[in-house]
Amino acid sequence: MTRKATQADFHFIKTLYFHPKTNPFLLYEMVDSERFEDIFNDLQAKKLLHIFETEGVARGMFKLIPLEFRTSHIAYLGGVAIHPDYFGAGFGSQMLLEIIELCRSMGLRRIELSTATINEKAIRLYEKSGFQKEGVLRDYCWLKSESRFIDEVMMSCLL
């Protein structure tokens, strides 16, 4: 099931953001705890953070950002991560199915996301879940840990 994140989810989300297997593919570089708390509180206040859980255990997270005006039929999906302890258990597929259903229930027509072109596992998962590639943003993200720019692939799913 997916639900809005609460203050009680801070530690889980922080663990995901700082985990070496997930951080390279998330928006924020490693920051100190105080800065991360500011980021979390800002996202929390805007009610953008969601938790995916099964059997009462948090397994993953995502941000869902509804767009406005002429694009109010679209949501941007970001910060998608499954905790590495649960890699390979099918939770990524399950979470994406639930995200798609959530977006349908919100009356949305389109979900957009971007991910690093080097994140091949995520791209396969998104494609398996109905997302299609729409283009590549060259030198889009600076990966500080590797001192290089990386390309991002834009993807979408029409509902």
Show which residues each predicted segment covers:
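Acetyl-CoA-dependent GNAT
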Residues: Q7-F10, K14-D85, L96-E98, L102, ...
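Conserved glycine-rich acetyl-CoA-binding loop
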Residues: R70, G79, H83-L97, M106, ...
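A short, glycine- and basic residue-enriched loop/turn
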Residues: I74, I123, E134-Y140, E152
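Structural preference for beta-strand elements that scaffold enzyme active sites
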Residues: I74, R110-E112, M154
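Conserved GNAT acetyl-CoA-binding A-motif
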Residues: C103-S114
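Conserved catalytic-core motifs of GNAT/GCN5-like acyltransferases
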Residues: E112-T115, E127, Q132-S147
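Terminal substrate-recognition subdomain of acyl/acetyltransferases
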Residues: S145-L159
